[in-house]
Amino acid sequence: MHIDRIELYLVENRFHKPWRTAYGSDPGNCAVFARMISGDKEGWSEASPLPGPNYSCEYGAGAFDVAKRFLAPSVIGRDFSSAKELNAAMSHVKGNPFAKSAIEMAWWCLDAYVKGKSLGALLGREKDEVDVGDGWGVYDSYDELIENIGKSLDMGYKRVKLKTMHGWDVEMLEAVRSVFPNETIHIDCNSSYTIDEIDIFKKMDKFHLAMIEQPFQNLDIYYHSKLQKQIETPLCLDETITEVWQAEQAAELGACGFINIKPARMYKE
């Protein structure tokens, strides 16, 4: 498939309320949209890093710049028969998975249009429907959080993810479980704790959470494995896993029971 043209757009989206997590407070997010054109067909994609480099080293304006200056020129005017070939053409750029995903996912969308298939069919879809969860950040009061959780459940969401941080963890979960004792709840720590705070997570076993996501720093596998051996609640790795080999190491070390897979975070050098 010949790539005739790529158009890139950087869009800033404002939230109704700032999104508060262990990383801080974000007033909105950034989206890098890519439009890839081949003949009379086109494919669109979206990669959404945060406005600043706090979740990862990438951020909105930076990902847009890398995609525009280094990645798009590497593929425009060339023919690719697979995503593997496309990624090989971008391999001179190290890392930057969000920027690369904007280009690659546009290619997948375009390839689906050209072949007349759904994207799900191309990716080997096994289900037509999946359960959707909702998520809430840090608030000024437990009552406000509990009210929002109730709204999510009333709307039919099957699970709810809660952001946590120092001062908004065990007591917060006590308050939530006093109102929602049996609902599927899990938490996301956004790398805000250390191995010296294992006792905090031992206290969380009584809440029967579905999982605890990314308690330790984003490059760590070893300390997550030590924590997992001392608690009953499954861990989930997010920022730590960017490539397949890291997932393999995490599995071998018993570092987690789940992996949060964000397509824009994953890449292969």
Indicate residue ranges for each PLM-predicted region.
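N-terminal capping/lid subdomain adjacent to the active-site entrance of alpha/beta enzymes
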Residues: 2-185, 192-195, 203-206, 230
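Catalytic core of soluble alpha/beta enzymes
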Residues: 162, 167-269
